[in-house]
Amino acid sequence: VNPPITYQNPPVGTKNGVTLLNDSTALFQLYAPEKDHVYLVGDFNGWLPSGTYHMNCSLDSTRWWLVVGGLSPGQTYGYQYLITNQARYADPLSTLILDPNNDNFVGNTTFPNMHPYPTGLTTGFVSVFQTTPPTYTWLNTGFNRPAKKDLVIYELLVRDFVSARNYQTLIDTIAYLDRLGINAIELMPNLEFEGNQSWGYNPSFHM
C-alpha cells in the first residue's frame, strides 16, 4: 500500500537530477508529471521501496524530490526511480549509468574500478553518482587557444583511433598529431549511447 503523497515544493532553484548538498547528503529530483507515486531505490536502501524513500511531489504535480542523508563521503552509489510500484528507471540526467547487457564488454583499462551492477536486486539501467566527487585542477594555465581561422582540426573516435581505447593513450599520442600539423582535436560524441557499437550519434541519457 502506497503511503499518502506529501505535496511540497523543493527548495527554490533545485535542478532535476542529483544535487549534492554536502559530502553526505544529496537531493534527488525527477521531472515526471501525471505519475501516481515515485520511490527512490538504490545502494543506500537495498533497492527496496519504503515509506522513507517515497518521494515528495511538487505542488504542480510535475517534480518528485527527496533529500537523502547519511551517505558516506567519497562513496559511489547506484540508484533508480521506481514509478507507481511497477517500472524502474535510471535518472534521465545521469552522467554515468550501469548497463547490465553491455558493461561486461568494457575492459578495466578503459574504465577502471567500474561500480558493480546490483545483480539480483534490480533490473535495467542504473544511475551512478558520487558524494564529494574529485575535482580537476588545470595544470597548464598558460595555454592560448588558436584563432578560429588557424585551426587545423582532427576529428577522431577514441575507440577506433587508439587500440587501447582510453584517453591516456590518446594523450600519449598528442606528439604524433602535432607532427601532422594538427592543433585541435574534435572528439566524436563521447556520451552514453544505446548498445555497445556506435560512433555516438544515437545519444542516450544526458551525458
Predicted regions and their residues:
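An acidic-aromatic substrate-binding cleft motif
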Residues: 121, 128-184, 188
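Core domains of carbohydrate- and sulfate-ester-processing enzymes
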Residues: 83-141
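Short, solvent-exposed loop/turn segments at secondary-structure junctions
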Residues: 35, 158-161, 192-193
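Aromatic-rich carbohydrate-binding modules that target alpha-glucans
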Residues: 22, 29-75, 84-107
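Aromatic- and acidic-residue-enriched carbohydrate-binding clefts of CAZyme catalytic domains
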Residues: 152, 193-207
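Non-catalytic, glycine-rich low-complexity segments
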Residues: 1-36, 118, 143
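Short catalytic/ligand-binding loop motif for oxyanion handling, primarily in non-cytosolic enzymes
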Residues: 89-90, 162, 193-196
